[in-house]
A protein has these predicted regions:
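Intrinsically disordered/low-complexity terminal segments and short unstructured peptides
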Residues: 7-8, 25, 223
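Bacterial N-terminal signal peptides
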Residues: 14-25
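Charged, low-complexity intrinsically disordered terminal segments
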Residues: 28-177, 183-529
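N-terminal secretory signal peptides that target proteins for export/translocation
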Residues: 1-11
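ATP-binding N-terminal substructure of ATP-dependent carboxylate-amine bond-forming enzymes
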Residues: 2, 15, 39
């Protein structure tokens, strides 16, 4: 398969490109592009499909509610996607920010082509920043009569795309961060996972602790509507209009994907999926679901073309309305967490009212983007002083935890799930981080599910894992030459009593990484992070 620039590298470099553009003073804005492709929409007559009839039977007694299943394990998340693609009869719609060039992405592409060969319509919408230079493969796939591929907010230069960051920074630094996967307009998955090994427990070195939710019924139709909004936007450009060079034939691409799926690595990974309980549930049509009402919220794609301060196209105000009534507890997981003064103030208000506020984010050692950690670090003392319980994910579980059972499938972990549980009654799952980039610059999607059972189970599981997978931060008063001052400490609460892991210094982070975070923290770039 073709291997070009790595999407993970692209993700890490974006904050630094933003910084460079800011220093150079480039802030050009573009006129909205013209529509380049014919419109197409979700197929509505899919009730007769295998999925449609199965879901209709299971939803009979649930009064227009949707059925939900959290996918907190990477293997489960990939297995469900493969089985849904195998079951597809009418359509598959995929929207993602990153599309790696590795074992799981090639398996994913292989299953898409197999579905297309059966007559299933496939629409694949990728942000142009995150496909890893795989345009020959993607354009070849798009030559299939049943496959369409569009790139969102494409760069004008196909050879040096980052150059656009310097000449058209205000638009090209803003990306489509949504992740959706919908089959036959009947079942849909949204959440934090892109397409690649680190998201699906296939990378032995680094694994993302992530979360998706599978939803069937009315929820799927809402996700289809969001997909259509992006697919038919002028920023979604067919790959054939962008890639003009010679392509591998569809036959050659099909053979390459088949060969990749039969490789030793792919077969070893697929073998790990066969023993999953969720596989048996799906094949026996006995998937355990939580039936509940939900609200789907997403940014309009016009967000990328308007002033960041104009929130008319933003999902954040709607999300705040859905989650503003807090009584007892807020559990927040955000891998990239830069709360700003307003959110710190809201946390303080909740604490004054007697509510518990707990936040889990990445430690510097676990964070894959040091620049983002720099923005977050400024707020730690204020968060703790406001009464927030602040936890940071370790890059590895505690020594007394059985690593063979850890949920990430890798030797090192990085948090990537974006979820919130409010009063153990409502749960948010989506692609949105609590940082300025997600709120004001990129586009995002998420769902608020009103289910005490689902939210309660998620909260209990989350709190049970914390002591072995995260450090708790506290402020202690220390004395020195210039008087007393507050100092951060990191605690391992998996021991009894808790032990201090580090005092005043980011644990398990090397000197260079600490310097990066410190230096970027001196610069006025928080709004870009």
């Amino acid at each position: 398969m073709h291997r070009h620039r790595r999407p993970t590298t692209a993700l890490r470099v974006l904050p630094y490109l933003s910084l460079l553009a800011l220093l150079l003073g480039t802030a050009c804005s573009s006129q909205p592009p013209q529509q380049l492709a014919p419109a197409s929409y979700a197929m509505t007559d899919t009730g007769h499909t295998f999925l449609g009839t199965a879901i209709e039977r299971s939803s009979t007694d649930h009064d227009q509610k949707s059925g939900f299943r959290l996918l907190n394990n990477g293997l489960d998340a990939f297995a469900v996607r493969l089985l849904l693609m195998e079951a597809a009869e009418a359509s598959i719609d995929v929207q993602t920010y990153l599309y790696h060039d590795d074992v799981t992405s090639q398996l994913f592409s292989h299953y898409l082509i197999r579905a297309a060969d059966r007559g299933v319509r496939v629409r694949l919408l990728l942000d142009d920043f995150g496909h890893g230079g795989q345009e020959p493969l993607l354009a070849s796939m798009a030559s299939h009569p049943n496959v369409s591929v569009r790139l969102f907010n494409p760069f004008s230069s196909r050879t040096v795309p980052y150059l656009d960051m310097l000449t058209d920074f205000s638009e090209k630094s803003r990306r489509m961060h949504n992740k959706t996967f919908t089959v036959d307009n009947q079942a849909a998955i949204i959440g934090g996972r892109n397409i690649g090994d680190t998201y699906f427990a296939a990378d032995p070195i680094t694994g993302f602790a992530d979360l998706d939710v599978l939803g069937v019924g009315p929820f799927a139709r809402k996700i289809s509507a969001s997909f259509d909004t992006y697919w038919n936007h002028a920023l979604a450009v067919p790959i054939a209009t962008l890639w003009q060079e010679e392509l591998p034939s569809l036959t050659a691409t099909r053979q390459a994907l088949t060969s990749s799926s039969e490789s030793e690595k792919a077969q070893a990974y697929l073998a790990r999926l066969t023993s999953l309980g969720i596989i048996d549930e799906l094949r026996q049509q006995q998937l355990e679901l939580h039936w509940a009402r939900s609200d789907v919220v997403y940014d309009h794609p016009d967000k990328l073309l308007t002033d960041p301060d104009d929130d008319a196209s933003h999902m954040a105000p709607e999300l705040v309305k859905l989650l503003q009534d807090l009584d007892n507890e807020a559990l927040i997981i955000s891998p990239y967490f830069i709360p700003g003064d307003a959110l710190v103030g809201r946390f303080a208000d909740w604490r004054t009212q007697g509510a518990r506020v707990l936040v889990l984010t990445n430690s510097l050692a676990a964070n894959d983007v040091a620049a983002v950690h720099a923005g977050y670090a400024h707020y730690r003392e204020a968060l703790l002083e406001a009464g927030t319980e602040l936890w940071e994910l370790r890059p590895r579980p505690s020594l007394h935890e059985d690593r063979s059972s850890q949920p990430f499938g890798s030797s090192r972990a990085s948090l990537h799930a974006k979820t919130m549980v409010f009063d153990r009654r409502k749960i948010f799952v989506g692609s949105m981080n609590l940082d300025p980039r997600s709120v004001n610059l990129n586009t995002e999607i998420g769902a608020v599910i009103d289910s005490s059972e689902m939210a309660g189970n998620a909260a209990e599981g989350f709190l049970k894992l914390l002591p072995d997978y995260a450090w708790r931060l506290q402020l202690v008063e220390t004395s020195g030459l210039f008087g007393n001052r507050a100092e951060l400490i990191w605690l391992d609460t998996g021991h009894s009593p808790p032990t201090v892991v580090s005092e005043g210094k980011e644990p398990e982070a090397g000197l260079w990484r600490r310097f990066q975070a410190w230096f970027i923290g001196l610069l006025p770039v928080e709004s870009l992070l």
